[in-house]
Curated annotation (Swiss-Prot):
Enzyme Commission number(s) from the entry: 3.5.1.77
Function field: The enzyme catalyzes the hydrolysis of N-carbamoyl-D-amino acids to the corresponding which are useful intermediates in the preparation of beta-lactam antibiotics. Industrial production of beta-lactam antibiotics is now being developed using this enzyme.
Organism: Agrobacterium sp. (strain KNK712)
Domain CN hydrolase: 5-276
InterPro entries named in the record: Aliph_Amidase/BUP, C-N_Hydrolase, C-N_Hydrolase_sf
Lineage of source species: Bacteria, Pseudomonadati, Pseudomonadota, Alphaproteobacteria, Hyphomicrobiales
SUPFAM superfamilies referenced in this protein's UniProt entry, alphabetically: Carbon-nitrogen hydrolase
Record-linked CDD domains: DCase
Protein name: N-carbamoyl-D-amino acid hydrolase
Length: 304
C-alpha cells in the first residue's frame, strides 16, 4: 500500500521592517487555510518567517535586536497558527529567530520547528551553516550578519516522525551542503524541508548573481536525488527593504524532478501529491547506502 499525502509550500512575499508579527501571522494563516482547502497534510513556511530579514542591518541597540527574536514558541501572537493547524488537521514547518537564556547568558539561534496536525511541536532544528560575516562591512549595499546575530546550531541534523512521514530540516544555506542532506538521508528522512531568504545579489561575488536561481534549484534537486527523498523549500521573496530576494520556492521528487514551483514574488501556495514509498525506488536500486557506501574512505570530510 502506498503512503500518499499532499505537501504544500507557503512562499512569503516581502515583510517590511515596520510590519508587525500580528500582520505576518494573518498572512501565514491565510496560506495555511488555502493549503488545507487543497487537501494538504503539511505546509512548509520560510526561514525567519515572522519578521523581516533583520541580519541585513547592523544593530548597536541590544533591545532593538532582541525584538526580532522569539523567547517562547508558540507565544501569544503565533499561537493562532498552531490552533488553526489543529482545527484543520494540517502540520507545518516554521522558521524563526530563537532567543534562550542559559546560566544568565543569552543564546541566539536561527531555528526551525516541525508541528504535527494536532498543533504540537514534534521537532526542532537550529541552523548550522551560517553564511555571511560578523562585522559591519561598509562596501555592502546591505549587510548579511548571521554570524553576528546567531551561533551555529547545536542539535545536529535530526529526523522526526511527523504524522505519517519521517522529516528532516534545513535552513537556507544548509541546502547547499551535501553533508546535511546525507546525514538526514542516512537517518531515513523521506521529506527534507526548510525555508530561505536568499538575496539575488551577492556583493563579494556579483559575477554569480545570474546563477542564484540555478544554484538554488541545483542544490534542491541534487540533494533529493542523491538521498532518495522528497524535498520542499519555501522562500521569502521579492523586494524586501531594498534587497531583492530569490523566488522559485519548490517541491522536488526523490528522482530530482521539480514537481511544483512558484511563479510569483509574493505570498503563494503550491502543492504536490507525494508518495512516500517512492523513496524506496532510489534507496533500494540506486543509492542503496548499506550495500554500496564505503565510509572507510570518507574520513577526510569530517577531519578537515
Amino acid at each position: 500500500m502506498t503512503r500518499q499525502m499532499i505537501l504544500a509550500v507557503g512562499q512569503q512575499g516581502p515583510i517590511a521592517r515596520a510590519e508587525t508579527r500580528e500582520q505576518v501571522v494573518v498572512r501565514l494563516l491565510d496560506m495555511l487555510t488555502k493549503a488545507a482547502s487543497r487537501g494538504a497534510n503539511f505546509i512548509v513556511f520560510p526561514e525567519l518567517a515572522l519578521t523581516t530579514f533583520f541580519p541585513r542591518w547592523h544593530f548597536t541597540d541590544e533591545a532593538e535586536l532582541d525584538s526580532f527574536y522569539e523567547t517562547e514558541m508558540p507565544g501569544p501572537v503565533v499561537r493562532p497558527l498552531f490552533e488553526k493547524a489543529a482545527e484543520l488537521g494540517i502540520g507545518f514547518n516554521l522558521g524563526y529567530a530563537e532567543l534562550v537564556v542559559e546560566g544568565g547568558v543569552k543564546r541566539r539561534f536561527n531555528t526551525s520547528i516541525l508541528v504535527d496536525k494536532s498543533g504540537k511541536i514534534v521537532g526542532k532544528y537550529r541552523k548550522i551553516h551560517l553564511p555571511g560575516h560578523k562585522e559591519y562591512e561598509a562596501y555592502r549595499p546591505f549587510q548579511h550578519l548571521e554570524k553576528r546575530y546567531f551561533e551555529p546550531g547545536d542539535l545536529g541534523f535530526p529526523v522526526y516522525d511527523v504524522d505519517a512521514a519521517k522529516m528532516g530540516m534545513f535552513i537556507c544555506n544548509d541546502r547547499r551542503w551535501p553533508e546535511a542532506w546525507r546525514v538526514m538521508g542516512l537517518r531515513g528522512a523521506e521529506i527534507i524541508c526548510g525555508g530561505y531568504n536568499t538575496p539575488t545579489h551577492n556583493p563579494p561575488v556579483p559575477q554569480h548573481d545570474h546563477l542564484t536561481s540555478f544554484h538554488h534549484l541545483l542544490s534542491m534537486q541534487a540533494g533529493s536525488y542523491q538521498n532518495g527523498a522528497w524535498s520542499a523549500a519555501a522562500g521569502k521573496v521579492g523586494m524586501e527593504e531594498n534587497c531583492m530576494l530569490l523566488g522559485h520556492s519548490c517541491i522536488v521528487a526523490p528522482t530530482g524532478e521539480i514537481v511544483a514551483l512558484t511563479t510569483t514574488l509574493e505570498d503563494e501556495v503550491i502543492t504536490a501529491a507525494v508518495d512516500l514509498d517512492r523513496c524506496r525506488e532510489l534507496r533500494e536500486h540506486i543509492f542503496n547506502f548499506k550495500q554500496h557506501r564505503q565510509p572507510q574512505h570518507y574520513g577526510l570530510i569530517a577531519e578537515l
